[in-house]
Curated annotation (Swiss-Prot):
Entry-annotated residues carrying 3-methylthioaspartic acid: 89
Function comment: With S4 and S5 plays an important role in translational accuracy. Interacts with and stabilizes bases of the 16S rRNA that are involved in tRNA selection in the A site and with the mRNA backbone. Located at the interface of the 30S and 50S subunits, it traverses the body of the 30S subunit contacting proteins on the other side and probably holding the rRNA structure together. The combined cluster of proteins S8, S12 and S17 appears to hold together the shoulder and platform of the 30S subunit.
Keyword list, A-Z: Methylation, Ribonucleoprotein, Ribosomal protein, RNA-binding, rRNA-binding, tRNA-binding
Family from the record: Belongs to the universal ribosomal protein uS12 family.
GO term, biological process aspect, one: translation
Domain of life: Bacteria
A Pfam family hit: Ribosom_S12_S23
Cellular component terms per the entry's GO annotation: small ribosomal subunit
HAMAP family per record: Ribosomal_uS12_B
Protein name: Small ribosomal subunit protein uS12
Length: 124
C-alpha cells in the first residue's frame, strides 16, 4: 500500500483499456471497399464454409469482415458498411458486414430478426 506522500509525488497510473475493434476508431460503423470476397473454414469442432470479405476502410485500415445471413451479392469493389462484432470460430475476424446498407443487399425471404439482416416488413 502506497503512503499518501508517495501518492502526492507520483499518482497512480491509469489502466489503458484496449479496444476489440481498433479499425473503427471509436465510430459505430465504417465504410469500406471489398478487396476480396471468399469463404473460409471455422476452427474445430465446427465445420462450414463461412462467407467473409477483405475490406479496405476509408481510414486506410484493411480488415476481414463476416457476411451474415443466407446468400449475398457482394463482389470485389462493392462499397459496404462494417460494424464491430467478432466471429468466435473464425480467428482474426473482428467485424461484421451491415446487411441492407450501401451495396450490400438484405437477406432474401427473411421473416424473423429482420432488422439484423436489412429486410423491410413484408406486405400483410
Amino acid at each position: 500500500m502506497a503512503t499518501i506522500n508517495q501518492l502526492v509525488r507520483k499518482p497512480r497510473a491509469k489502466k489503458v483499456e484496449k479496444s476489440n475493434v481498433p479499425a473503427l476508431e471509436a465510430c459505430p460503423q465504417k465504410r469500406g471497399v471489398c478487396t476480396r470476397v471468399y469463404t473460409t473454414t471455422p476452427k474445430k469442432p465446427n465445420s462450414a464454409l463461412r462467407k467473409v470479405c477483405r475490406v479496405r476502410l476509408t481510414n486506410g485500415f484493411e480488415v476481414t469482415s463476416y457476411i451474415g445471413g443466407e446468400g449475398h451479392n457482394l463482389q470485389e469493389h462493392s462499397v459496404i458498411l462494417i460494424r464491430g462484432g467478432r466471429v468466435k470460430d473464425l480467428p482474426g475476424v473482428r467485424y461484421h458486414t451491415v446487411r441492407g446498407a450501401l451495396d450490400c443487399s438484405g437477406v432474401k425471404d427473411r421473416k424473423q430478426s429482420r432488422s439484423k439482416y436489412g429486410v423491410k416488413r413484408p406486405k400483410a
